[in-house]
Amino acid sequence: MAEKLNPNATLLAIDKSEKRQKFTLENFQKRNLSYEVKTALPEDIKGSFDLVLADVPCSNTGVCCKRPDSILRFSAKDLASITKIQKQILEEAARLTNSNGQLIYSTCSIEPEENILMVEEFVKNHKDFSLIKYEQLLPTLEHDGAFAALLIKK
């Protein structure tokens, strides 16, 4: 995605995990991308953006072929906890999205509560957003499962 952006674009990586921040920066360096990458917490950010990607923490049920233990460790209590966090992140991502901007919501989950149900509830409660399209990939031996939805802010 970053490779398709305007070369003068500023990328802003928001993640509490220093390990994931480092991983993101390493990926940009591997691809010889010359973007300025900043890390911050959502509450520290002023302004809004044309494109926001919310790749949220999830149950990891989409990686069950690679890590079968992800299914064994998963519980209804975990689902309730993780969906609460996902809603908070989606709310922050919405706040950071410009009018006429795009918001991409993604997980590596196959759980409807984390995916299409989350997005449908969000759009129902945020009349200024429209669901343009979504895709749910189920896990196979060739690839992990994943979900992504494209929302537009009116």
Protein language model regions, located:
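S-adenosylmethionine
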Residues: M1-K154
